[in-house]
Amino acid sequence: ATSKTDTSLKAIHMTPSVPGGTLREAERENYRFFLRLPEFDRTRLKVGTVKGSQFLLPLFEYSGACAGCGETPYVKLLSQMFGDRAVIANATGCSSIYGGNLPTTPWARNAAGQGPAWSNSLFEDAAEFGLGFRLSIDQQNEFAKGLLTQLTDVLSDHSTVGTTVGAILDADQSNEAGIIAQRERVSWLTDNLRRMNTPESLHLLSVVDALIKRSVWIIGGDGWAYDIGYGGLDH
């Protein structure tokens, strides 16, 4: 407070930064300009290096973690490298407080609407929780491949070079370029399934995204790692 006698002044006294809010509006426009900047081509970046990875778009931003938190830089890096296809099994603790402080969340999405899928387990069983994610995703992938194989003859009439059923089933998704190529093939498949509008095509349409490789991660805070649960024995 600037006065010990004026009781209207508190320890923190809020006043407008600039009358009329002109400064805030100018900064909002600067931020909108920043968001419109194009992203780097992920296939041309050396994401295996620290320098190269930092050119990737973070899909974890503005979290409510404590200042100096040692975990969030790693979570941000994870979101840069795998965020557009990440599935995260979170353990209750710090990572659930800064990661799911609803109605806000630091987990973001890119211009295509892709971003991490995040869920939290209350029971400190993140290992089992994450394993369940992995098993269910693998099962959905096999199920989608089986349905796709049944529709091979129908889809062959719509195939072009690089978008055949065989290319989808045998896709190499071991690197960024392969995953992007698979996304394009699955997009082609999705369009054709919608046009077909048969029970079989609609069934496959419900799980078609499982044909794109997912990256499953288990995240926990310090409480999960050291304090909570059965003395860490279940971890």
Predicted regions and their residues:
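Generic, well-ordered alpha-helical scaffold segments in large soluble proteins
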Residues: 1-6, 72, 77, 81-85, ...
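Iron-sulfur cluster-binding cysteine motifs and their immediate structural context
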Residues: 1-22, 26, 33, 49, ...
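Thiamine diphosphate
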Residues: 71-77, 84-87, 97-104, 196-235
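Glycine- and acidic
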Residues: 54-65, 125-130, 167, 171, ...
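Mobile "lid/hinge" segments at catalytic clefts and subdomain interfaces of large enzymes
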Residues: 100-138
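Gly-rich Lys/Arg/Thr-decorated short loops/hinges at beta-loop-alpha junctions or inter-strand turns
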Residues: 50-61, 183-189, 212
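Short secondary-structure boundary/capping segments
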Residues: 19-21, 30-33, 102-111, 232-235
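N-terminal leader/propeptide and maturation segments of large enzyme subunits in energy/redox metabolism
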Residues: 122-197
